[in-house]
Regions:
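Carbohydrate-active catalytic/glycan-binding domains of CAZyme proteins
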Residues: 1-107
């Protein structure tokens, strides 16, 4: 799902000292998905989550072609992650979507 290229990352510290990176993976110039990886120091040894991609296009919806530009907030009080992203459907334009991950553990 990310064989063409990757980019557009956003990195956040985790309470246990590790770091998480949210990024865009492109299978081709028109199709993008969002993935995540964990690093012990935020610089090296990034390990992709086994659940990647974490956000993918959904047929016949606003994001049928691509999901990209992740913006992420860790809500410790609500014990969840909120991920806003741009979704594109080639025939209907571009919109903003929101994915909510319940729980603070991403792995």
């Amino acid at each position: 799902w990310e064989q063409d290229r990757i980019g557009g990352c956003e990195v956040h510290p985790l309470p246990d000292g590790r770091w998480v990176m949210f990024y865009i993976g492109y299978s081709d110039i028109h199709t993008a998905r969002i993935g995540a990886a964990i690093s012990p120091d935020g610089v090296t040894r990034w390990t992709r989550l086994k659940t990647n991609p974490i956000v993918s296009p959904t047929p016949d919806t606003f994001d049928a072609s691509a999901c990209y530009k992740p913006s992420v907030f860790r809500d410790d009080k609500g014990e969840r992650w909120l991920l806003w992203y741009n979704g594109r459907n080639t025939n209907k334009g571009e919109y903003i979507g929101l994915v909510i991950h319940k729980g603070l553990d991403l792995e």
